[in-house]
C-alpha cells in the first residue's frame, strides 16, 4: 500500500452579516448550484491565504479572521481525494459583486 495519493485541497467560507449568509450560485459544470464561495489551494499557499484570495476573487469582499469550522474529504470515481476546509467569518470589507464563477447574494 502506497503512502502517497493524489489530493486536491479546496476551501469554502460562510460569510455572515447579522442574520444573513452570503451564498453563490456556481455555474461550473464540475460543481454547480448554490454553495459558499471558495476554491482551490495553490501550491505553496497557506489555507488561510487561499480562502481569503478565493473569496476576494468570487465576491469582491476582503475577509479577515476566518475560523476553521470543519473539514470534509471524499474520493471521486477515480480514487482522487478532495479535502475541503470549511471556514466562517463575520469580518469583511468591500462591495459585493458577482464573478464569472457565479452570482452572489
Residue ranges and their predicted role:
Residues 1-21, 37:
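Conserved N-terminal beta-strand and adjoining loop/helix that marks the start
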Residues 15-16, 23, 88-91:
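Conserved hydrophobic "DFG−1" position in protein kinase catalytic cores
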Residues 17-57:
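Conserved Nudix-box catalytic region and its N-terminal flanking loop in Nudix hydrolases
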Residues 41-64, 74-105:
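Unchanged
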Amino acid at each position: 500500500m502506497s503512502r502517497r495519493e493524489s489530493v486536491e485541497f479546496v476551501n469554502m467560507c460562510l460569510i455572515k452579516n447579522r442574520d444573513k449568509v452570503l451564498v453563490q450560485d456556481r455555474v461550473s459544470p464540475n460543481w454547480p448550484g448554490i454553495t459558499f464561495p471558495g476554491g482551490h489551494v495553490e501550491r505553496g499557499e497557506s489555507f488561510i491565504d487561499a480562502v481569503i484570495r478565493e473569496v476576494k476573487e468570487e465576491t469582491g469582499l476582503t475577509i479577515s479572521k476566518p475560523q476553521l469550522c470543519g473539514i470534509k474529504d471524499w474520493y471521486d470515481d477515480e480514487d482522487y481525494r478532495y479535502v475541503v476546509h470549511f471556514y466562517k467569518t463575520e469580518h469583511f470589507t468591500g462591495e459585493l459583486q458577482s464573478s464569472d464563477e457565479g452570482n452572489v447574494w
